[in-house]
Every structure is written in structure tokens, then in C-alpha cells.
Amino acid sequence: MDHVMHVDQHVRYALVLQTSLGIVLAANYGFIPGGAPVAFAAAAFGILWLGFVEAVHRLRKHEAGPLLGKIDRVSRYILMAVLLATSLSLIGGAWPMPGWLRWKLAAFTGVMACGVGIRFALIAHFRTWAQMAASGVTPERNALIRATYVQATAVLVLLWVFIGVIVWLSIAKPV
């Protein structure tokens, strides 16, 4: 199942790149204060964050792995809270950010939340596969695999709905 962790890295890279690029664009378009200095800081932070994500991946089986993984997860939960608070104008309510962009931040938070949901489903999936490898296949374990698959697929469909909303908001800019 190690190959899944390699595939999962692409999603993590996308999160870092989208978040950093989004802040760069928002600063350069004047949707958030700070202009070019904030844009450069966001780009630099994005590069550091990308390095951290890669370190978390490469060191996951090292003794520091669990701590790095926890820092990585907690930082994503904090980012989700900040994005949601910004979308609700709890942060940056006075910023000249258009409504469509605030909705886009809310949808991006939804994408991230779906990623968390898929991760939880995969944890259950891996646990069941490990039990099957250790002590064999049973009808109950097969049922767990099917149930986990259905749950993860439902979350994945919701994730694509959020992505569709993001694309539509980016093109239409309705509010």
C-alpha cells in the first residue's frame, strides 16, 4: 500500500501550490492588502511549505515521522479554519474581496474537508486490508471493504462538486 502514499503526494503538492498561488494572485489583484510584498512572501512561504510537505513524506517512517505528520495535519486544519473564516468575512471583512472569491474560498475549504474525509476512509480501508493479510478474508471484512469504498466514493463525488463550483465561480464571477 506504499504506492498510495506516493500518489497522495500529488494532492498535497496541489494544496500547497493552489494556496500559495491564490494568495499571490489575491495580493497582486488588490483583493487582500499588502500588494507585491505579500505576494513575494506568499511565494517564499509556499516554497518552504512545499519542502516541508516533501520532508513529511520522505521521513514518514523515521522516528520524527509521526510528529511531522501531526504538524502537517494540524496546519491543514488551521488553514481550513482560516479559509472558512475569510470566506465568511470573519477575517478580512473590510478587504475589497469580491463575493465570488469568498465563495471560492468556502468551496476550497470543502475540497480540503473532502480530502480529510477520504483520508479517514483510507485509514479504515488499510486497517481492514491488514487484517485480511494477517488472518484471512471473511464476509465481514469484505463487507467493510465495500462499505469503505462506497463512503470514500461518495466523498470523492462531493469533492468533484466543490471543484466544479470553484471552476464555475472562477469563470462566471457571479457576485
Predicted regions and their residues:
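Polytopic transmembrane helical bundles with strong interfacial aromatic enrichment
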Residues: 1-175
